[in-house]
């Protein structure tokens, strides 16, 4: 039973046992030298927490809201392509887990089953995430389906002008299902702010811009009236030698100036990671690799268990920090620190065999 997992690293170990080498590398790897992916972890490891004491923390509320919807904890489920390679139900398992636990899932335009089937799998709010793989008529047809299916918000990914060089996959000579019939690359490569405006107007839903990595682009995004800035480097799978997402957060929060909500993904494996992001100005975070590992370990039940374990870590850390609500966190609760171990995609765990599964 999924409840038998007592720590998230047990889910990682089970996922490795269940996945082929090809699928494991697709889920776990990054681009080229995987420097960006490592920096996602390094950014969190470079921050220490500053607890306050003698505070009544007998009652703690770890919940928040996102676009008007209640989240049990400030953790959402990031869009992942080809989920069907991780668990037979694919995106349906994620939708059901999100509803069961009490969070929001992002549905990738390159996963299975269809966006309609995933939408029908649960009644909880969902966000549709789009890669532009066709002309504006194609985009319009997708948006019409999204609206009809009842999605609550629309997310446009903009850090994939070119597909990153993911060398684990290349050397495996394997492609995920979504890449086996390659999309026409000119559409993603030719996206501009004007294209984004047209898609935003067409969508007519709360609009999330995913892949923002600098203050400069955050400032432009709020001028274009996006509702949410989603800080992401695609889990370190696109541009190598980029920054970790938590390192981007302070400048983007400042540039947005409260005119858009800020969320981020990238390297989040622990409740303390979540709280560091909230303290520095994020409204919520999203998990990608951890979500995938949990699904591969035990499907829907595994993902619910991962969220339960994160919730326990978050509540424990809040109590030890001396806060009872997330809005009590601020930059005063974090400070620079030296990491104590080399950073990689599993360096937040202490009992992974050999320290890292490959």
Task: Locate predicted features.
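C-terminal helical cap(s) of enzyme catalytic domains, especially alpha/beta-barrels
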Residues: 40, 171, 241-254, 295-315
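Short, conserved beta-strand segments within well-ordered enzyme catalytic domains
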Residues: 48, 54, 63-65, 74-78, ...
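Alpha/beta enzyme core
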Residues: 82, 96, 117-121, 134-264, ...
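Outer-membrane beta-barrel proteins
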Residues: 129-133
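A compact, surface-exposed functional segment
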Residues: 276-304, 336, 340, 353-358
């Amino acid at each position: 039973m999924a409840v038998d997992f007592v720590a998230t690293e047990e889910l990682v170990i089970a996922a490795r046992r269940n996945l082929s080498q090809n699928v494991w590398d697709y889920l776990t790897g990054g681009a080229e030298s995987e420097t960006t992916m490592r920096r996602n972890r390094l950014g969190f490891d470079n921050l220490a927490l500053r607890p306050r004491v003698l505070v009544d923390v007998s009652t703690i509320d770890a919940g928040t809201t996102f676009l008007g919807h209640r989240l049990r904890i400030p953790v959402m489920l990031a869009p992942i392509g080809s989920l069907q390679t991780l668990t037979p139900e694919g995106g349906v398992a994620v939708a059901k887990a999100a509803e069961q636990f009490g969070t929001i899932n992002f549905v990738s335009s390159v996963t299975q089953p269809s966006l309609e089937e995933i939408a029908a799998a649960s009644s909880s709010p969902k966000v549709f995430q789009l890669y532009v793989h066709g002309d504006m008529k194609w985009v319009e047809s997708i948006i019409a389906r999204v609206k009809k299916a009842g999605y609550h918000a629309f997310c446009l990914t903009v850090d994939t002008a070119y597909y990153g060089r993911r060398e684990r996959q290349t050397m495996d000579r394997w492609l995920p299902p979504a890449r086996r019939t390659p999309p026409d690359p000119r559409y993603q490569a030719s996206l501009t702010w004007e294209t984004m405006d047209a898609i935003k107007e067409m969508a007519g839903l709360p609009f999330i811009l995913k892949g923002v990595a600098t203050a400069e682009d955050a400032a432009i995004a709020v001028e274009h009236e996006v509702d949410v800035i989603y800080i992401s480097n695609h889990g370190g799978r696109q541009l190598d030698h980029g920054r970790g997402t938590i390192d981007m957060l302070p400048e983007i929060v400042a540039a947005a100036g409260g005119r858009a909500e800020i969320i981020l993904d990238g390297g989040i494996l622990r409740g303390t990671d979540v709280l560091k992001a909230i303290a520095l100005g994020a409204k919520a975070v999203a998990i990608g690799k951890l979500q995938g590992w949990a699904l591969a370990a035990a499907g829907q039940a595994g993902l619910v268990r991962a969220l339960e374990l994160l919730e326990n870590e978050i509540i424990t850390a809040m109590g030890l920090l001396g806060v009872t609500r997330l809005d009590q966190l601020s930059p005063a609760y974090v400070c620079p620190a030296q990491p104590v171990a080399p950073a990689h995609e599993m360096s937040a765990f202490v009992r992974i065999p050999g320290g890292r599964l490959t």
